[in-house]
Amino acid sequence: MTEYANRSARGRARTDDEAQLREQLLSALERERRDAALGLVDIADGGSLQPSTVARLAGRATDDDAADVRQFAVEALGLAAQGADGEGAAETAIRTALDDDEDWVRAEAVVAASRAAPDDEATLREALNDESGYVRRNAVVALSKTGAASQELLTERIKSDRHPAVREYAADFLREYAADTAEAVRILAAVLAREPEAFVRAKAAASLGDLGTDRAEEALERHGLNDRSDDVRRSAKRALATARGVDPKQIDAGLDDPGAPGGGPGSRTGDGPDGPGGGPGGPGMAGVTDGLTQGQRENR
């Protein structure tokens, strides 16, 4: 899931010979099967796979006991399905993987589905209903990258999704789908003021800079430049420079000044979790997380 902010631990295979890797998929050792699937990801990313290899990957993607093997087999199939895929074996296995018990396999399957059938908007939209925030995040990214997202869809995710990574990418892509610029700026300004997660606020700041209206600049000055997070302040400074068409060095950020009144949970004047309109459960922001632990996130 390299395009979707998940690390794919490539480069572990001891060979780049497709036939050898195909045979290694039958190994009794989970580690060898996983490394074989990863090796085939690299090969598929650089070209196509033979139908016999696709067929064996399809079996690993749906029947392997190890979730890691299934995940990386699905990743390889998503790349292989962009070329000749052995009479639809790749797409069939990917669809099966969308119902896998493991969150990360389903999340990978969303990416693979967007590659194998980018026009299948219904499948990607269905993934927005998945219980896992990481699956929903990948659905938001896939819909946005395939041109099937909308301002309404992204705004709804920003307002109601409980997983911060979903809100992060919805805020990031909203700039590209802002049919109603004023409304998009209003939503992103609210995110910058009220969203509890700094990385979501940083993406909102970047989007505001690209939209570049007077209201966007006001939000960046009032909330972004006074945010308690260094990352958000840097993002806001760059965004303000983008909006004004100047070098970021020309922006007098005033980062050492006290935060502006009404800065929300991210500003240096709104330290409490229940600041003006913000914090978990606050109006318009989902504010709490679900899904996997930090250790599980980093493990991928």
Predicted regions span which residues?
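Structural detector for internal amphipathic alpha-helices that build alpha-solenoid repeat scaffolds
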Residues: 1-13, 31-48, 68-85, 104-118, ...
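Short inter-helical turns and helix N-cap capping residues of alpha-solenoid HEAT/ARM repeat scaffolds
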Residues: 28-30, 65-66, 101-102, 131-132, ...
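N-terminal alpha-helical scaffold/docking segments in eukaryotic complex subunits
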Residues: 1-79, 226, 233-300
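Amphipathic alpha-helical scaffolding segments comprising HEAT/armadillo-like alpha-solenoid repeats
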Residues: 12-25, 45-63, 82-99, 117-129, ...
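Extended, compositionally biased low-complexity polar/Lys-Gly-rich tracts
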Residues: 92-98, 103, 107, 137, ...
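Short amphipathic alpha-helical patches
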Residues: 59, 136, 162-166, 177, ...
